[in-house]
């Protein structure tokens, strides 16, 4: 589980645990 900041700018990508908000 990475920090949401990582997926914050990548909301376009599928949230496979990459900081799913």
UniProtKB/Swiss-Prot annotation:
Sulfotyrosine modifications at: 6
Q: Where is the composition biased (Acidic residues)?
A: 1-10
Does the entry feature the keyword Secreted, yes or no?
A: yes
Claim: Phosphoprotein is one of the keywords in the record: no
Q: Which UniProt keywords apply?
A: Adaptive immunity, Blood coagulation, Coiled coil, Disulfide bond, Glycoprotein, Hemostasis, Immunity, Innate immunity, Pyrrolidone carboxylic acid, Secreted, Sulfation
Q: Which residues are glycosylated?
A: 4
Subunit notes for this chain?
Heterohexamer; disulfide linked. Contains 2 sets of 3 non-identical chains (alpha, beta and gamma). The 2 heterotrimers are in head to head conformation with the N-termini in a small central domain.
Query: Any domain commentary?
Result: A long coiled coil structure formed by 3 polypeptide chains connects the central nodule to the C-terminal domains (distal nodules). The long C-terminal ends of the alpha chains fold back, contributing a fourth strand to the coiled coil structure.
Record's protein name: Fibrinogen beta chain
Q: Which organism is it from?
A: Bubalus bubalis
- Taxonomic placement: Eukaryota, Metazoa, Chordata, Craniata, Vertebrata
Gene encoding this chain?
FGB
């Amino acid at each position: 589980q990475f920090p949401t900041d990582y997926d914050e700018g990548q909301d376009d990508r599928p949230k496979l645990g990459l900081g799913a908000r």
